């Protein structure tokens, strides 16, 4: 590519690299271009949608709109952005499935029932995890569950939800990890994604 620019009069903007699997090759291509000091643009609409922060917000909205069903609750919990760890989410899952827990009201109330084969003393630990989740999403549940609102109002609720969470700090930690590992493409994505999302919600 550099040879074409140097010897044939091409400009970098006139050269395209096409792949049938952007998700697999985008990061590798970005690293190669960075190392070769070649200016580039990657159309990463799909991969950005797969960013854990974006997935976290999509799951949060789906969860609130649909009334906290099992599928969207655990999709949210497994994005890696919640204060509930994935290990803790795994501990909740069997209980939620066994007893059909659905709706924010059920998540906000103390659990006392024990299903067959469950060790009774585990209910205390499950309640501690439940409380973390219930408090984390309380204002989101109240905001989305209290009547129809304008798009602007929903965006404000989401902005407040994001700002009160520790998502920004988690994104920064991931950004540092990618920087340390030399993954410049992912470092850049994690550096920019918070601002991009907040700007969109602000508009």
What are these regions (language model features)?
Residues 1-203:
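Polyanion-engaging groove/track-forming segments
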């Amino acid at each position: 590519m550099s040879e074409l620019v140097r010897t044939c009069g091409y400009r970098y903007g006139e050269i395209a690299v096409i792949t049938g699997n952007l998700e697999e090759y985008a990061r590798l291509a970005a690293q190669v271009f960075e190392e070769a000091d070649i200016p580039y643009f990657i159309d990463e609409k799909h991969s950005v949608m797969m960013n854990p922060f974006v997935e976290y917000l999509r799951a949060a909205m789906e969860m609130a709109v649909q009334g906290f069903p099992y599928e969207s609750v655990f999709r949210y919990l497994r994005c890696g952005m919640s204060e509930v760890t994935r290990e803790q989410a795994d501990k909740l899952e069997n209980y939620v499935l066994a007893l059909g827990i659905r709706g924010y009201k059920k998540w906000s109330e103390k659990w006392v029932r024990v299903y067959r084969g469950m060790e009774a003393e585990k209910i205390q630990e499950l309640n501690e995890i439940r409380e973390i989740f219930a408090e984390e999403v309380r204002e989101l549940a109240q905001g989305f569950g209290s009547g129809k609102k304008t798009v602007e109002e929903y965006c404000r609720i989401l902005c407040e939800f994001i700002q009160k969470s520790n998502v920004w700090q988690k994104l920064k930690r991931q950004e540092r990890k990618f920087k340390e590992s030399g993954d410049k493409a992912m470092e850049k994505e994690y550096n920019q994604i918070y601002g991009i999302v907040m700007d969109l919600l602000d508009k």
